[in-house]
């Protein structure tokens, strides 16, 4: 098979429908054992001064951190998939297995409390910061 240039590949992808592209991505992920999902959470690097300023104000954004899955890992994985949008089964399992991990970042207090309640009901240990 002749090697296709990046430009030729992009032209070929441009002709595909969204359904065909979705099927291609799934097949690519399976063949090469990779994932095209965006990272769930990325910790922001910040200095001490902004943290001190935030502490002086009333906190309006919260992070939900999965500390441990507990004994009911399958239930926790289901809840993680429910509260973290766009997460596949494998990604949710990897996230739960890799605890402690941040699940949600910079969400409203109500959303953080709701996620914490659901995760704790499933048997997980969760902190909200």
Curated annotation (Swiss-Prot):
The keyword Ribonucleoprotein applies. It comes from the Bacteria. GO terms for cellular component: cytosolic large ribosomal subunit. GO terms for biological process: translation. It holds the Pfam family Ribosomal_L12. Disulfide bonds: none annotated. The keyword Phosphoprotein does not apply. Keywords: Ribonucleoprotein, Ribosomal protein. InterPro entries: Ribosomal_bL12, Ribosomal_bL12_C, Ribosomal_bL12_C/ClpS-like, Ribosomal_bL12_oligo, Ribosomal_bL12_oligo_N_sf. One of its GO terms (molecular function) is structural constituent of ribosome. Forms part of the ribosomal stalk which helps the ribosome interact with GTP-bound translation factors. Is thus essential for accurate translation. Belongs to the bacterial ribosomal protein bL12 family. Homodimer. Part of the ribosomal stalk of the 50S ribosomal subunit. Forms a multimeric L10(L12)X complex, where L10 forms an elongated spine to which 2 to 4 L12 dimers bind in a sequential fashion. Binds GTP-bound translation factors. This is Large ribosomal subunit protein bL12. The lineage of its organism: Bacteria, Bacillati, Actinomycetota, Actinomycetes, Mycobacteriales.
